[in-house]
Design a protein with these regions (language model features):
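Conserved small/polar residues in nucleotide/adenosyl-binding loops
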Residues: 1, 160-162
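Low-complexity, charged, repeat-rich alpha-helical/coil interaction segments
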Residues: 113, 159-160
C-alpha cells in the first residue's frame, strides 16, 4: 500500500523540480498534474512554490483558474510546503477574489500556523486599504479564532516594516 504522505512528498518534489527547470511552463504543468489527481493539488502547489518561489503565485493562480473549488487546498499546500512564499500566494488569491479571503487565509494558517506572519504580510500587501484589511481580519477571526491572533500579529509586524 502506498503511503499518502510519501506520495504527496514525491509529487511535491516533482512539481518543485518542474517549477525550477521550466518556470515559463510551470503553471501549465502544475494544472496538468492537478487534473490527473486533484487530491494532490496542495502537494503540487507547495512543491512548485518551494522549487521556485518566483513563480509560486502565478502557478497557484493558474491552478485556481483551472479548478476554483481547490483554492483552499492550494493555499494550504503552499503554506505547508513553502511557508515564506505563502504570503505572496494567499495575497494574490485575496486580491483576485476577496470573497475567498477568510477561507484561503484559514486554510493556509491551519495547514501551517508558522506561516501566519507571512500570510498576513502578503494579504496586507495585496489589500492596502485599511478598512478592507480590518474586514478581512474580522472574517479570519470568525472563521478561525485560534489563528486570528497570529494573523493580527503578522499584520502588525508587516505595518512596522512598511
Amino acid at each position: 500500500m502506498v503511503n499518502p504522505d510519501m506520495a504527496g512528498d514525491f509529487v511535491g518534489e516533482i512539481a518543485g523540480g518542474m517549477a525550477a527547470g521550466a518556470p515559463q511552463a510551470a503553471g501549465e504543468i502544475a494544472v496538468g498534474m492537478m487534473e490527473s489527481n486533484p487530491d494532490m493539488a496542495g502537494d503540487i502547489a507547495g512543491g512548485a512554490a518551494a522549487g521556485n518561489p518566483q513563480v509560486a503565485a502565478g502557478v497557484a493562480m493558474e491552478m485556481v483558474g483551472a479548478d476554483p473549488s481547490l483554492v483552499n487546498d492550494i493555499a494550504g499546500g503552499v503554506a505547508e510546503g513553502a511557508p515564506a512564499t505563502a504570503g505572496a500566494v494567499v495575497g494574490a488569491m485575496v486580491a483576485d477574489n476577496p470573497d475567498v479571503a477568510a477561507g484561503v487565509i484559514d486554510a493556509a494558517m491551519t495547514a501551517n500556523p508558522a506561516a501566519a506572519g507571512a500570510v498576513a504580510g502578503g494579504v496586507l500587501a495585496a489589500v492596502p486599504d485599511g478598512d478592507a484589511a480590518v474586514g478581512i481580519m474580522q472574517e479570519v477571526a470568525a472563521a478561525n479564532p485560534d489563528a486570528a491572533g497570529a494573523f493580527a500579529g503578522g499584520m502588525a509586524l508587516s505595518l512596522i516594516h512598511i
